[in-house]
């Protein structure tokens, strides 16, 4: 065997070794970057409190009897003592028209006190997601279908808007007069004119609605979207920017709004729209100082 043949064989051997090493590194990257975080999340979810609603209320009816409405966003106005609830504006996905509005609802969810018919002001609005109010009484809402956050007064008149991709959850931060906005991939802190001041990368399947706990510097957000399995409540520590699961909600299958009032976690479900495991538009109430676990659930 001549020297050139030996060199070629040696070169081929090194190339094969290099290809093997690259393939091995790619596998390590996939395991480290994709699989291990999912395993960690699954382990964290298993450690969470698994809770059931202490009380469940049907949403009040609007146009149709015994259906409620398609709830999409929840805000408690402690000054007025009413809930502001987004209404996607149609009962089923195949309905032809959207009539998105904000419903003003009694604390016990018995009746709708009034509404803000946003669809009359904004022709291109296809739905509403999150809803919140700032300290001056004006309203902010996520118009997911338009990729906008809209700012309106209590009569629905436009004050302004800014563009943001796929906004779903929103909360006003009265400490800084800014907004926290959850999208499919990020949690943003924005000024009222839409300038992003802080970005936190978050990508949990089905992340959607949020609530800000100013006292403890925590964001709560909902996740999970298969409509027949568990849903989750996560927290984000705004000091460390770390997200972690807090509760597994065993009986909320179509979450479309969350808030905490007097140690009660209110969770809106639009199960009728999604044909969920519980196909009812309702609010599930979880008493955080008397949590209902699987062992004592009736």
Residue locations for each model-derived region?
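Blade-level signature of beta-propeller repeat domains, shared across WD40, Kelch, NHL, RCC1
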Residues: 256-298
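Short coil/turn segments that connect the beta-strands within blades of beta-propeller domains
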Residues: 79-81, 136-137, 175-177, 215-217, ...
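Structural motif
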Residues: 92-103, 147-150, 186-190, 228-234, ...
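Surface loop/turn motifs at the tips and blade-to-blade linkers of beta-strand repeat domains
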Residues: 57-67, 116-124, 161-165, 200-205, ...
């Amino acid at each position: 065997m001549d020297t050139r043949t030996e060199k070629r064989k040696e070169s081929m051997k090194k190339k094969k070794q290099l290809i093997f090493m690259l393939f091995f590194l790619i596998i390590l990257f996939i395991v480290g970057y994709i699989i291990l975080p999912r395993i960690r999340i699954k382990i964290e979810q298993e450690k969470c409190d698994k809770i059931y609603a202490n009380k469940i209320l049907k949403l009040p009816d609007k146009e149709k009897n015994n259906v409620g409405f398609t709830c999409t966003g929840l805000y408690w106005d402690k000054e007025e003592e009413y809930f502001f609830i987004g209404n996607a504006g149609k009962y089923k996905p195949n309905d032809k028209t959207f009539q998105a509005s904000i419903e003003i609802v009694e604390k016990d969810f018995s009746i709708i006190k009034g509404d803000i018919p946003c669809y009359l002001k904004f022709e291109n609005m296809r739905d509403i997601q999150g809803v919140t109010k700032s300290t001056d009484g004006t309203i902010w809402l996520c118009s997911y279908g338009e990729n906008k956050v809209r700012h309106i007064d209590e009569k629905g008149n436009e004050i302004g808007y800014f563009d943001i991709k796929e906004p779903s959850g929103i909360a006003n931060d009265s400490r800084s007069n800014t907004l926290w906005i959850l999208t499919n991939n990020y949690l943003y802190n924005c000024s009222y004119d839409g300038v992003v001041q802080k970005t936190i990368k978050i990508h949990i399947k089905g992340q959607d609605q949020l609530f800000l706990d100013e006292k403890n510097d925590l964001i709560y957000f909902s996740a999970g979207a298969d409509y027949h399995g568990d849903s989750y409540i996560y927290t984000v520590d705004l000091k460390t920017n770390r997200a972690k699961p807090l509760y597994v909600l065993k009986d909320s299958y179509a979450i479309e709004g969350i808030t905490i009032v007097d140690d009660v976690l209110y969770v809106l479900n639009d199960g009728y729209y999604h044909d969920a495991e519980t196909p009812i538009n309702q609010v599930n109430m979880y008493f955080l100082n008397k949590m209902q676990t699987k062992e004592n659930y009736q």
